[in-house]
Amino acid sequence: MFGLKAKSTKKVLGSIPKHIGIIMDGNGRWAKKRLKPRVFGHKAGMDALQEVTITASELGVKVLTVYAFSTENWSRPQDEVSFIMNLPVTFFDKYVPVLHENNVKIQMIGETSRLPEDTLAALNAAIDKTKRNTGLILNFALNYGGRAEITSAVRFIAQDVLDAKLNPGDITEDLIANYLMTDHLPYLYRDPDLIIRTSGELRLSNFLPWQSAYSEFYFTPVLWPDFKKAELLKAIADYNRRQRRFGKV
């Protein structure tokens, strides 16, 4: 049940995007501005994620997909990668109780084979604990790359054609979507309505390239650790000033 403040905020904002994707960028620069190591920014980014998740849940957002670690991020310094890989352990230990209380369901997309055992264990434990929740889906894109996702889907489709499980004529956009990592999401909410990128960068960085075909984009110079409730509301207000045409006039 929404509180009076949440209901009032929804009324002012107008239409709430059902699926929001966020490219959480700027942790390192945020730390550098404070003369701190990059890992300090990643830690601060966890607090921002918790606040944004609860806010999105209160507003009635159905899916929040966050770009936590890309397939390209393995090329970063090893000590930073190790710290980032431990963040899910810390995040879930600290925040799963409050997310669970708010009926948030945790899921993920990405290739799990390279994830450290403790990272994967923490993720699976959080998924299992919240699997019966019916509220917002907090969908972590962890070791995720959009091109790799599409390549994998093509391979599976090709194999099914070879195995006579599919005819080439059966291949449609909807069928391809069923082979993507987002196929576990509710059908109506698989594609983001709004994609937000923080830190002033103006690119997708391999984030949901198929699913974002008709997404609205919001780029902000705000660094991720500073992206809290007020910034999310600004992004949604901007989204409401758009007219989504989906290729039509």
UniProtKB/Swiss-Prot annotation:
Mg(2+) binds at residues 25, 216. Binds 2 magnesium ions per subunit. Substrate binds at residues 26-30, 38, 42, 70-72, 74, 76, 197, 203-205. GO terms for cellular component: cytosol. GO terms for biological process: polyprenol biosynthetic process. It is an enzyme of class 2 (transferase). This is Isoprenyl transferase. Belongs to the UPP synthase family. The lineage of its organism: Bacteria, Bacillati, Bacillota, Bacilli, Lactobacillales. Its EC number is 2.5.1.-. HAMAP family: ISPT. The active site is at residues 25, 73. It comes from Streptococcus pyogenes serotype M1. InterPro entries: UPP_synth-like (IPR001441), UPP_synth-like_CS (IPR018520), UPP_synth-like_sf (IPR036424). GO terms for molecular function: ditrans,polycis-undecaprenyl-diphosphate synthase [(2E,6E)-farnesyl-diphosphate specific] activity; magnesium ion binding; manganese ion binding.
